[in-house]
């Protein structure tokens, strides 16, 4: 079940987990097996598990894949809030997601070998 998998080595209270599940729209699936959830719900469970880890660095690979616009916005807000004290590398194919989430943006293309790194300040000062 979702809740049981969330508490493996966790020391955090179930109260915080319930709040975070509500924030991500996962209320009501606490006792379901992850394999029974939709793709979008599984994605949010994966984000929840990653963000609750006691790690200084997180790699988030396409964390918004399969999410509708409203759920994507909630998930972005959750990651921003929970990730304030963490270093995160977020991989995405969506430049708008990168601009919304990143302090620094690295774009690369295999086709023409372009690698560009910018500080994300909406004016994007290149380094």
Regions found by a protein language model. Give the residues of each.
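Catalytic Walker B motif of ABC-type/P-loop ATPase nucleotide-binding domains
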Residues: 58-62
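Conserved H-loop
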Residues: 85-92, 94-101
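Conserved signature/switch motifs of ABC ATPase nucleotide-binding domains
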Residues: 53, 84
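Helix N-cap at the start of a conserved alpha-helix in ABC-type nucleotide-binding domains
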Residues: 69-70
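Conserved ABC ATPase signature
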Residues: 33-37, 41
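Conserved ABC ATPase "signature" region
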Residues: 12-29
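Hydrophobic anchor residue at the start of the ABC signature
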Residues: 47
């Amino acid at each position: 079940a979702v809740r049981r998998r969330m508490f493996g080595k966790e020391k955090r209270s179930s109260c915080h987990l319930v709040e975070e599940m509500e924030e991500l729209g996962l209320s009501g699936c606490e006792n379901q097996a992850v394999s029974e959830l939709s793709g979008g719900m599984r994605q949010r469970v994966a984000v929840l598990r990653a963000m609750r880890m006691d790690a200084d660095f997180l790699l988030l690979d396409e964390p918004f894949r399969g999410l509708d616009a409203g759920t994507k916005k909630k998930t972005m807000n959750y990651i921003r809030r929970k990730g304030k004290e963490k270093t995160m590398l977020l991989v995405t194919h969506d430049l708008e997601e990168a601009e919304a989430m990143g302090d620094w943006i690295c774009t690369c293309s295999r086709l023409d070998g372009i690698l560009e790194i910018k500080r994300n300040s909406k004016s994007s000062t290149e380094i």
